[in-house]
Amino acid sequence: MGGPVAAVPCGNADLQISSGYGTQSQPLQASAVVFTNIGDHTCTLQGYPGVAIAVDKTVVNAARVLNGFRGDLPALGSPPLVTLVPGASAYAVIEWMLSDGQSCYPTGTGIIETTAPNTTRTVAISGGAHVGRQGICSSLEINPVVPGTFGT
């Protein structure tokens, strides 16, 4: 009766959240949010992280999209269940468009904040997200968590 123990969902204490590799190709930009299991047991993630950029009184929330602009992520039918052994990482890609003459958010520099799927702790992962005419202008999107690493 001592069979394998089913993995439990990752909790706040199980995860280290950080910014990962980014790419730039005008006007599309992308960056990864990395989730690393720092716990002592296997856990799972599934779904979309919460992602927002806070600039003064403006908060720009990322829209959840299954497959992004870039077309280089796995074609998904639904968000996968990602199993993380201790020390393993998964990621989600944030994508946005730079200004190409359309109306933009108010110009400023903000903080990217993220919350892992099905958890409650929000973490600031970047202090230099530019919005408005010189930065994130529209179409801020977040893709679901997938296993592995992005862009390396």
Regions found by a protein language model. Give the residues of each.
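Short, surface-exposed ligand- or partner-binding patches at beta-edge/loop junctions that are enriched
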Residues: 98-123
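The feature marks short-to-medium sequence segments in extracytoplasmic or secretory-pathway proteins
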Residues: 46-84
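Low-complexity, acidic Ser/Thr/Pro/Gly-rich terminal tails and inter-domain linkers that flank the onset
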Residues: 1-25
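Asparagine-centered strand-capping/turn motif at beta-strand->loop junctions
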Residues: 33-40
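Acidic, serine/threonine- and proline-rich intrinsically disordered appendage/tail regions
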Residues: 121-152
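Short Pro-Gly-centered flexible turn/kink motifs
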Residues: 81-95
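Short, solvent-exposed loop/turn segments enriched in Ser/Thr/Gly
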Residues: 26-32, 106-109
